[in-house]
From Swiss-Prot:
Keywords: Amino-acid biosynthesis, Aromatic amino acid biosynthesis, Cytoplasm, Transferase. This is 3-phosphoshikimate 1-carboxyvinyltransferase. The lineage of its organism: Bacteria, Pseudomonadati, Pseudomonadota, Gammaproteobacteria, Cellvibrionales. InterPro entries: Enolpyruvate_Tfrase_dom, Enolpyruvate_Tfrase_sf, EPSP_synthase, EPSP_synthase_CS, RNA3'P_cycl/enolpyr_Trfase_a/b. It holds the Pfam family EPSP_synthase. The gene is aroA. It catalyses: 3-phosphoshikimate + phosphoenolpyruvate = 5-O-(1-carboxyvinyl)-3-phosphoshikimate + phosphate. Pathway: Metabolic intermediate biosynthesis; chorismate biosynthesis; chorismate from D-erythrose 4-phosphate and phosphoenolpyruvate: step 6/7. It comes from Cellvibrio japonicus (strain Ueda107) (Pseudomonas fluorescens subsp. cellulosa). One of its GO terms (cellular component) is cytoplasm.
């Protein structure tokens, strides 16, 4: 197994230009593909997840051209993919798999969607159930409720109301919202359970509006996609920096004194994960913001222990689980059940690896409590479970004054292929 050995860190200072947001990148690619007109996409994230979406769109007959290092030109299909038969390998990219499932269910073709073994363990049944309510023909090729899937042509009767759960993954609602304009019918979506990760739905709604579709919502329980609401290209779309990726560098600024500035997200960001900066501020970190940047510094450690609900920022919350090693008492992360159905079971994985470092960790179905210890265990090999965020989070353990070995560091290619190079430039 490949690994990277990280030296102990004492200081962090500098500025980081963030890679593009994964959530915005893959949503924008699909919307541009479904739209009328041609779209220039600037600052797209270069990663495994976006590569899988680009490959899928190409297989579906979308004309796309790379025009710069992170820039693309897409010719929209007007809501109908040219190729009516395709076999799509989507890796472990939930931001590609879920939205494409919905879009292809309305596309009148025969499509097989599959991925890596972990993708076949990630639930999709709630989305499939919702799509079947309007007539979609979707078959499970393995275990009921999970990928891989076979989609066949079907008569879609989208008028009326679709019921869907919101407490497993917000990507199911995102997928429905993005695909329903393809039907041309007014459709209502009703949530039958609490919606998690609401900020990710905000991203979806804002991007849909940018492409000309205004979804009406009644609180977070009911959404209406208007009739005759096809997508129209806005011309050029700029992708924000990834706010989840910002969390590691803001935390480094907190643990290493700082200041560390992230560029590409700021006070005007549409991403909910910028709230990570507020969570840091609440435990004693000095945060300053501009329209397109955030900066973190801290005069001294330890930081304040916390007990906080992270339902709205589950990805960035992982970073705080490692930051908890440097707090002045037990810290508790709650309402994080969605961690269990991500790239790995993140509650179990985080608990296992924090214990290796010496922390006292308790876990429940939807919570994690971390009690720090005076001295971390040195030269601990951290397993990453093919999960990019596990690898990036545990780089912060080096601020405990110990070397840390990260196994399979290349898993960061999912969202941030150059992460460890950039991290090494701001820490010392």
């Amino acid at each position: 197994m490949e690994f990277i050995d990280l030296a102990p860190s004492a200081h962090a200072r500098g500025a980081v230009q963030l890679p593009g947001s994964k959530s915005i990148s893959n949503r924008t690619l699909l919307l541009a593909a479904l739209a009328q007109g041609e779209t220039q996409i600037r600052d797209l994230l270069k990663s495994d997840d976006t590569d899988r979406m680009l490959e899928a769109l190409t297989s579906l007959g979308v004309t796309l051209t790379r025009t710069g290092e992170n820039d693309y030109h897409l010719v929209g299909t007007g809501g109908s993919f040219p190729h009516k038969e395709a076999d799509l390998f989507l890796g472990n990219a939930g931001t590609a798999f879920r939205p494409l499932t919905a879009a292809l269910a309305f596309s009148g073709g025969t499509y097989k969607l599959h991925g890596v073994p972990r993708m076949h363990e990630r639930p999709i049944g709630d989305l499939v159930d919702a799509l079947r309510q309007v007539g979609a023909d979707i078959t499970y090729l393995g275990q009921e409720g999970f990928p891989p899937l076979l989609i066949k042509p079907a008569h879609i009767a989208a008028q009326g109301s679709i019921k869907i759960r919101g407490d497993v993954s917000s990507q199911f609602l995102t997928a429905l919202l993005m695909a329903l304009p393809m039907t041309g019918k007014e459709t209502h979506i009703e949530l039958v359970s609490e919606l998690i990760s609401k900020p990710y739905i905000e991203i979806t709604l804002r991007l849909m509006a940018q492409f000309g579709v205004e979804v009406q919502r009644d609180g977070w329980e009911r959404f209406t996609v208007p009739a005759a609401s096809g997508y129209v290209s806005p011309g050029t779309v700029y992708v924000e920096g990834d706010a989840s990726s910002a969390s590691y560098f803001l935390a480094a600024g907190a643990l290493g004194g700082g200041p560390v500035r992230v560029q590409g997200v700021g006070a005007k960001s549409i991403q909910g994960d910028v709230a990570f900066a507020d969570a840091l501020e609440a435990i004693g970190v000095t945060i300053t913001k501009g329209d397109n940047w955030i900066e973190a510094s801290a005069p001294q450690l330890p930081l304040k222990a916390f007990n906080r609900d992270f339902n709205h920022i589950p990805d960035a919350a992982m970073t705080l689980a490692v930051v908890a090693l440097f707090c002045d008492g037990p810290s508790r992360l709650t309402n994080i059940a969605s961690w269990r159905v991500k790239e790995t079971d993140r509650i179990a994985a985080m608990a296992t690896e924090l214990r290796k470092l010496g922390a006292i960790v308790e876990e429940g179905e939807d919570w994690l409590q971390v009690t720090p210890v005076p001295t971390l265990n040195a030269q601990v090999p951290i397993d990453t479970y093919d999960d990019h965020r596990m690898a990036m989070c545990f780089s912060l353990a080096t601020f405990g004054g110990v070397p840390v070995r990260i196994n399979d560091p290349q898993c960061t290619a999912k969202t941030f292929p150059t992460y460890f190079d950039v991290f090494s430039q701001v820490v010392s």
